[in-house]
Amino acid sequence: GFNAVTSVSEEWALNYSKESHPDRKTRYQIADEFLDVVTGLWENRELRFDPDGIRRFYADPINHQGKNYQVLGPLNVAPSPQGRPLIAQAGGSGPGIKVAAKHAE
């Protein structure tokens, strides 16, 4: 699974090239965009059989241009048997619940 955590401390934020810890609303806006990107990458690839019977990997660019991320894609890793990991998000604030409702299983 994939646990989408927006971090709780200044020290953790510094691990991701941030000069300071964003406020809660901003963290969840960033998380929402990140989850859009990563699920787009996960869901935009497949293994399928060509007409010649050979199983091949296919993936298309996602061309994401957002406020926080610019990702052309595609993800260059074949999908796992389940396609993508289960997404968990345990935020209890209003913004956290909104992100969980949109992205988490």
Predicted segments with their positions:
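Internal, glycine-rich beta/alpha segment that forms the wall or movable "lid"
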Residues: 2-103
